[in-house]
């Protein structure tokens, strides 16, 4: 299920809610379409409302700013992305993350590759919470003199850079191969 579909399903479907849902979906889809075409920083609210075919006041009645629209996108994306099934091994879980970025490459990956500060900060927070704990014990045992905060920073930064490299240049490798590279280092 795509992020957009999850977004739409999260709203109750009463008569008034349908209008709200339709408007929010139009704004959200316009935003995603613009992310496919250009960097987040260069997107204007005017472009979003023109493409969504809504008025400025309508946009602002749903979102105070394009930053809050980005925030909602990140929340929906990361909720799905980091919702880890308990039966998955760390390698399969990491493959899930890679596959998600590959599947949503256009709009989501553009945020990663453009080094959007907000997106990277949110991604970093999620990785610290969900990915680092999977490798922490082994790393701490292997490197007892290195501060835990540095190890966490190293794991998260390395993951983001590995993901970015794979999306830009390494697609001749499967998700599993790249994850193996990541875990071996």
Residue spans for each PLM region:
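Residues in the helix-turn-helix
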Residues: 26, 44, 58-60, 107
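C-terminal peripheral helix-coil segments that are non-catalytic and often amphipathic
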Residues: 2-7, 165-185
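Amphipathic alpha-helical packing segments from all-alpha helical-bundle domains
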Residues: 116-161
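Alpha-helical structural segments
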Residues: 22-33, 37, 51, 68-88, ...
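Residues that mark the N-terminal boundary/hinge immediately upstream of a DNA-recognition element
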Residues: 44-45, 65
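Basic, helix-initiating cap at the start of DNA-binding domains
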Residues: 1-38, 47
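Amphipathic alpha-helical segments that line or abut small-molecule/effector binding pockets
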Residues: 91-106, 121, 153, 176
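Short hydrophobic/aromatic patch on the recognition helix
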Residues: 53-63
